[in-house]
């Protein structure tokens, strides 16, 4: 199971204060050093702890099967693309599987993944992804989040806007019965988006993986079977 952390919990590491390091960066470093999922990801060969969130989503909803076309929005550093590649048994020589990953930041090659290095919000990006897909997608997934500033309401709205953009794109490229997965932060303003999603998908669920930090307001919107 992805939440089995036996052997990954280390002795608590304290982070010394530094004049060059802000309080927020010190807190982030402390969390990273003491996070068992970070240690587990390093050992398991995943590029980020976020890989376990997608694994848990799959364990719950059984979304990924071989011979799929998948779009991974905001893919860097590639943890979700790695998981999708493993679950659908993708390879560079298997044309029946296709994963299109996009991010403004470069990511190292993942087997069976075609990487598009562009800003998702640039005018021509959607058309580039559609051309690369060469058909309709089975899954559109987004772990995109805005750079947080520590103000919960602002962070909530900014990440919600990213989710809305991903949702609008998903409607354009998903095949009937396709699925949409996206991160949102709880904060109250998400209800309008949820109503829109429910009109377009047969089943819409909220899911908070155990690998999501307990103090975080993040949850995942899992929309199943596009109408």
Curated annotation (Swiss-Prot):
Tell me yes or no: is rRNA processing among this UniProt entry's keywords. Answer: yes
User: Which residues are noted in the entry as S-adenosyl-L-methionine-binding?
Assistant: 78, 80, 103, 119, 143
Query: Where do the catalytic residues lie?
Result: 183 (proton acceptor)
Compartments where located: Cytoplasm
The record ties this protein, via InterPro entries, to:
RNA_methyltr_RlmE, RNA_MeTrfase_FtsJ_dom, rRNA-MeTfrase_E, SAM-dependent_MTases_sf
The record's keywords, sorted A to Z, are: Cytoplasm, Methyltransferase, rRNA processing, S-adenosyl-L-methionine, Transferase
**Record protein name field:** Ribosomal RNA large subunit methyltransferase E
Top-level taxonomy: Bacteria, Pseudomonadati, Pseudomonadota, Alphaproteobacteria, Rickettsiales
């Amino acid at each position: 199971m992805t939440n089995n952390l036996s052997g990954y919990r280390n002795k608590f590491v304290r982070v010394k204060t530094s004049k060059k390091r802000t309080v927020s960066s010190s807190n982030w470093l402390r969390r990273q050093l003491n996070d068992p999922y970070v240690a587990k990801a390093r050992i398991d060969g995943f590029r980020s702890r976020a890989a376990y969130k997608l694994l848990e989503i799959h364990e719950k909803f059984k979304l990924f099967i071989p011979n799929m076309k998948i779009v991974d929005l905001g893919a860097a550093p590639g943890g979700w693309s790695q998981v999708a590649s493993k679950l659908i048994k993708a390879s560079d020589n298997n044309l029946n599987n296709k994963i299109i990953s996009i991010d403004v930041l470069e990511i190292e090659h993942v087997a069976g993944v075609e990487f598009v290095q562009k800003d998702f919000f640039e005018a021509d990006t959607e058309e580039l992804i559609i051309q690369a897909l060469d058909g309709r997608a089975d899954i559109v997934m987004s772990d995109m989040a805005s750079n947080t500033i520590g103000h919960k309401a602002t962070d909530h709205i900014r990440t919600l806007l990213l989710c809305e953009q991903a949702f609008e794109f998903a409607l354009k490229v998903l095949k009937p019965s396709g699925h949409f997965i996206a991160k949102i932060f709880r904060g109250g303003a998400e209800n309008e988006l949820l109503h829109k999603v429910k009109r377009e998908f047969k089943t819409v669920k909220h899911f908070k993986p155990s690998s999501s930090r307990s103090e975080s307001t993040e949850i995942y919107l899992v929309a199943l079977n596009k109408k």
